[in-house]
UniProtKB/Swiss-Prot annotation:
This is Large ribosomal subunit protein uL24. GO terms for biological process: translation. The gene is rplX. One of two assembly initiator proteins, it binds directly to the 5'-end of the 23S rRNA, where it nucleates assembly of the 50S subunit. One of the proteins that surrounds the polypeptide exit tunnel on the outside of the subunit. CDD domains: KOW_RPL26 (cd06089). Keywords: Ribonucleoprotein, Ribosomal protein, RNA-binding, rRNA-binding. Part of the 50S ribosomal subunit.
Amino acid sequence: MQRIRKGDKVVVITGKNKGGSGIVLKVLTKQNKAIVEGINKVTVHKKEQVNKRSKQTNPTTKEAPLPLNKLALFDQKAKQQTIGKIKYQIDPKTKQKTRVFKKTNNAI
């Protein structure tokens, strides 16, 4: 089960981007990686398709995937990171499960 989902606020806990935070844009479950907004940017050079002989390239930057074990969920109310441990609470009005942090009982 993946604890980190699309739209979650996460913090990088190891590596060159340690301490950086952002929102998860996409989770790649088969590769066990996630793409985080503004973290792990790489430059990609793409050729223009104007004609076959043109050799112009446009450098653009985009986010590269990060392994999930380098990320931790961030509790915005408590202003601290939590590694894993999520429990579910059933909302009595809507009868739906909501994810909450086990340590602080704040909703994710």
